[in-house]
UniProtKB/Swiss-Prot annotation:
Protein's organism: Encephalitozoon cuniculi (strain GB-M1)
S-S pairs: none
Pathway as given in its UniProt record: Protein biosynthesis; polypeptide chain elongation
Lineage of origin: Eukaryota, Fungi, Fungi incertae sedis, Microsporidia, Unikaryonidae
Cellular compartments per GO CC: cytoplasm
Matching Pfam families: GTP-eEF1A_C, GTP_EFTU
Region spans: G5: 196-198
Annotated function: GTP-binding component of the eukaryotic elongation factor 1 complex (eEF1). In its active GTP-bound form, binds to and delivers aminoacyl-tRNA to the A-site of ribosomes during protein biosynthesis. In the presence of a correct codon-anticodon match between the aminoacyl-tRNA and the A-site codon of the ribosome-bound mRNA, the ribosome acts as a GTPase activator and the GTP is hydrolyzed. The inactive GDP-bound form leaves the ribosome and must be recycled by its guanine nucleotide exchange factor (GEF) (eEF1B subcomplex) before binding another molecule of aminoacyl-tRNA.
Family: Belongs to the TRAFAC class translation factor GTPase superfamily. Classic translation factor GTPase family. EF-Tu/EF-1A subfamily.
PANTHER family per UniProt: TRANSLATION FACTOR
Domain tr-type G: 10-239
Originating gene: TEF1
PROSITE patterns: G_TR_1, G_TR_2
Protein's name in the database: Elongation factor 1-alpha
Subunit structure: Component of the eukaryotic elongation factor 1 complex (eEF1).
SUPFAM superfamilies in UniProt: EF-Tu/eEF-1alpha/eIF2-gamma C-terminal domain, P-loop containing nucleoside triphosphate hydrolases, Translation proteins
Length: 471
């Protein structure tokens, strides 16, 4: 693939593309990459031929990111794919996330590495994205939980709307998107623009535009945004915590002949260098880095906010084959990461009409680190201005403080130390049922001493005994 040479002097921005299945996320990434020169005409012609062989002629733009046979034959994104895209202002890591409800975990992996979320919604078929079974609202909520503080909303497939109705349809979808975003995300004034990914309209400054669209601007006197390229360049790079101890959650483990295992992920805190003594938790592996790379280019140091690959030297202590996605790399010193079996949490219940009670075991997601998590105790909940101690149930919309026990130890921390390792989503049947953060990670001894939770005891038997005692 012929690409522009990356300018290392430009800051890095990480952008995830999210939205319901068939909204055109991969097509948008493909056409944007082509128009900005990150992929050449010959490569696109190759994708056209491959798409034709799969009887998916209109999907060829998506082949830049949809690389597996399963993705190409089904016409959907399954894994999160990383594409490097240089713009006038940034070197952008584009993370193309799956929209299908069966692959929410993969979407979470992509969103957990991003600074900004690009939400792709179709002008035609918008109702299916926000109706029963639609994943749009869930994606927006998850992106906010995982730290994407800014949104760019692209109303796609505008070319499929009759020309005399495009402005009306765009305004209608924009109003509904504003309503959805205000209810589920921190960014109350997202950039909203119309695009046609397949036709390449409103993607780049030099490309074709919708003449009826007069642009988006944050406030009077600020820049007017017409295209996705301008919307990306309008972003500010979030604060990077290079001065903090190293924390790098692993997103993927690859085995390369002659090299060994490569661990990829984003440096959430601190920096990582070659010849650094590290530990990987909860696997319990200890080793030393041999090389660190960005897009296959060796670096002397990887700063916070970068996605990279890490290779280790020989002589690793521990079972390296047990290292998996969701494990965390840190320096092997007094500030190393620790895996905990449980935590004291503060949570708001959302999207669960019947509420929740002790014993409920949803999936708990800390970015791409996840495990079933049993709500072992509900210590208190807030109803209006009143605090109720030891309630039997927490209703939808109520806040509670409780104790969660993980099925397997997870690397977590307090908000004030590493907030990206403290924020989580509770999920059930691919839907978000709770949003919260860690007040205090708890060791096995703390769970027993402070809360009477014995991890050696069968939780079902304990619950049954407690019920008999109460009776």
């Amino acid at each position: 693939m012929a690409t522009k040479v990356e300018d290392d002097s430009k800051p890095r921005l990480n952008a995830c593309f999210i939205g319901h299945v068939d909204s055109g996320k991969s097509t948008t990434v493909g056409m944007l990459s082509y128009q900005l020169g990150a992929v050449d005409k010959r490569e696109m012609e190759k994708y056209e031929k491959e798409a034709a062989l799969n009887n998916k002629e209109t999907f060829y733009l998506a082949y830049l990111t949809d690389k597996t046979d399963a993705e190409r034959k089904r016409g959907i994104t399954i894994t999160t794919t990383l594409v490097n895209l240089p713009t006038e202002k940034f070197n952008i890591n584009i993370l193309d996330c799956p929209g299908h409800k069966d692959f929410v975990k993969n979407m979470v992996t992509g969103a957990s590495q991003a600074d900004v979320a690009v939400v792709i919604v179709p002008a035609s078929g918008f109702e299916s994205c926000v109706g029963v079974g639609g994943m749009l609202k869930t994606h927006i909520m998850i992106s906010g939980i995982l730290g994407c503080e800014k949104l760019i909303v692209c109303v796609n497939k505008m070319d499929e709307i009759p020309e005399n109705k495009r402005m009306e349809k765009f305004n209608e979808v924009s109003a509904e998107m504003l309503r959805i975003v205000k209810r589920s995300h921190k960014d109350k004034n997202p950039i909203i623009i119309p695009i046609s990914a397949f036709k390449g309209i409103n993607l780049t400054k030099k490309g074709e535009k919708f003449e009826w669209f007069k642009g988006w601007k944050e406030k009077e006197g600020s820049s007017v945004i017409y295209t996705l390229e301008e919307a990306l360049n309008y972003q500010d790079v979030p604060e990077r915590h290079n001065d903090k101890p190293l924390r790098m959650p692993i997103t993927k483990v690859c085995s390369i002949a002659g090299v060994g295992k490569i661990f990829t992920g984003r440096v959430e805190y601190g920096t990582i260098t070659p010849n650094l003594k590290i530990t990987i938790q909860p696997a319990g592996v200890v080793g030393e880095t041999r090389s660190v790379e960005i897009h296959n280019k060796p670096r002397s140091m990887i700063p916070c906010g970068e996605n990279c690959g890490v290779a280790l030297k020989g002589g690793v202590i521990g079972e390296i084959d047990k290292v998996d996605a969701g494990h965390v790399i840190s320096a092997n010193d007094e500030n190393k990461a620790v895996a905990y079996p449980g935590a004291k949490i503060r949570t708001i219940v959302v999207g669960r009409p019947k509420g929740l009670s002790p014993g409920y075991t949803p999936q708990i997601n800390f970015g791409n680190c996840h495990s079933p998590g049993r709500i072992a105790k509900i210590l208190s909940k807030v109803v209006g201005k009143e605090v109720h101690e030891n309630p039997e149930n927490v209703a939808n919309g109520e806040n509670f403080t409780g104790i969660v026990v993980f099925q397997k130890p997870l690397v977590i921390d307090k908000m004030e130390r590493f907030q990206n390792l403290a924020k989580f989503a509770l999920m059930d049947s691919n839907g978000v049922v709770g949003i919260g953060n860690v007040m205090e990670p708890l060791t096995r001894d703390q769970l027993l001493k402070d809360y009477g939770i014995d991890l050696n005891e069968d939780p079902k038997a304990a619950k049954k005994a407690a019920s008999k005692k109460k009776a």
